Amino acid sequence: MAEVRVRYAPSPTGHLHIGNARTALFNYLFARHAGGKMILRIEDTDQKRNIDGGVESQMKYLEWLGIDWDEGPGRGGEYGPYFQMERLDLYKKYTDELLEKGLAYRCYMTSEELEAEREAQIARGEAPRYSGAHRNLTQEQEEAFVAEGRTPSIRIRVPESVTYTWNDIVKEDVSFESKDFGDWVIVKKDGIPTYNFAVVVDDHLMAISHVLRGDDHISNTPKQMMIYDAFGWEYPTFGHMTLIVNEEHKKLSKRDQSIIQYIEQYKDLGYLPEALLNFVTLLGWSPVGEQEIFTKEEFIEIFDASRLSKSPAVFDQQKLAWINGQYMKHQSFEEVFEASLPFLQDAGRVSSEPTEEELVWAQNLVGLYREQMTHGAEIVELSEMFFEDELVYDEEANTVLAGETVPAVLSEFASQLRTLEEWTPEAIKGAIKATQKATGQKGKNLFMPIRVATTGQTHGPELPNTIQLLGKDRVLARLDA
């Protein structure tokens, strides 16, 4: 059996989007499950739209997610170069071959002529497509156009009456008719190949066995099959994954500001890469059974492309927050702290170069809220009461403090705290028990007034640990207020 070889081939026109990350991840899992190779190829022919640092950004956040590749930028490989702009001589070689065989031809029509043709077709109620006006130019006609200073594009001769059919990994049987396509451009006037031509040359020369991509590429597939046929090359196996939609079941748009869509943004919010990988894998793929939390190694072991969904994948941010919260609870504390500390520093609550004492305090703070956090950035909002000079009470808190027995409880608790020789959670727990014994109050009548008076909140993490971390002076000042 031939080696499984897949590719992720982004354009450096932007940063790593959640949809592109899913494409990369599914290719990665498919290859690793089969013991095959994943290739990273950069499709950088759209020079006007490429952004500075686009390639580096794609690579950085793929690696951050834990998606590694076997060949490509930073790895090398025997099928390079892996940037399309470094492969122009290869594309020219294969373009010349098609021209020599008569399977492609030069088209000298100007953009104005093409637009006029298109408008006339629309006016007649026809689907706009290239008419083939320059399909059979004589040598004299071509020479005349060249003399006018016209630069040609190169078009493929679309075969007549051919049905292009393939068995898609996701969509099953898919068919297109060649009559629905006009002769399309394979090389633009500037000599740069179009996507559907270059991608076939690259996939063939790089021995790509499976092409897994979004189903917005389905209409590209018959065009690519035309190129495979023109050279007599074998098709790879195609699989077109359903698109990602929002909760209103509309296609996820990069302009939709209500959804965070870039991997970099999630990293900057303190999400954990393992959690994001877990969530993205479940966007359009499902395992057997009800389990939802998996390690990358487990995903590699169980990944089965036949379980790719035929229905659009709904992007549920609450589900992502829940998954990340599970990882915040169970990942190593070092990783959770690393995802949280920068936010405390940015908020000015921990210095940029913390002392050992500050680090220990910050670690205790993150440990205190670890069970409540869904991502690192939340530590700032959750821990606000540690940094407020005056507490602001909501209606529920004021109701608690208005209780008849509250003054006696708070006064006794303050007295008990003043007698403590050690400021530890265990000692504070002892002070709470002593307050219970002295006042006769227990349960909510005991704990709620103490929590509200010291933290301003009716809910929160373990009370003795919270009080210990607040510090004795701050706690007594709040109790005496």
From Swiss-Prot:
This protein's name: Glutamate--tRNA ligase
Binding site for ATP: 254
Keywords: Aminoacyl-tRNA synthetase, ATP-binding, Cytoplasm, Ligase, Nucleotide-binding, Protein biosynthesis
Cellular compartment(s): Cytoplasm
Claim: Ligase is one of the keywords in the record: yes
Organism: Exiguobacterium sibiricum (strain DSM 17290 / CCUG 55495 / CIP 109462 / JCM 13490 / 255-15)
Enzyme class: ligase
Motif 'HIGH' region, residue numbers: 10-20
Motif 'KMSKS' region positions after renumbering to this chain: 251-255
Molecular function as annotated in GO: ATP binding; glutamate-tRNA ligase activity; tRNA binding; zinc ion binding
Family: Belongs to the class-I aminoacyl-tRNA synthetase family. Glutamate--tRNA ligase type 1 subfamily.
Record-annotated disulphide pairs: none
EC number: 6.1.1.17
Catalytic activities: tRNA(Glu) + L-glutamate + ATP = L-glutamyl-tRNA(Glu) + AMP + diphosphate
NCBIfam families per UniProt: gltX_bact (TIGR00464)
CDD domains in the record: GluRS_core
Gene Ontology BP terms: glutamyl-tRNA aminoacylation
One Pfam family, short name: Anticodon_2
One annotated Gene Ontology cellular component of this protein: cytosol
Assembly, per entry: Monomer.
Functional note: Catalyzes the attachment of glutamate to tRNA(Glu) in a two-step reaction: glutamate is first activated by ATP to form Glu-AMP and then transferred to the acceptor end of tRNA(Glu).
Top-level taxon of origin: Bacteria
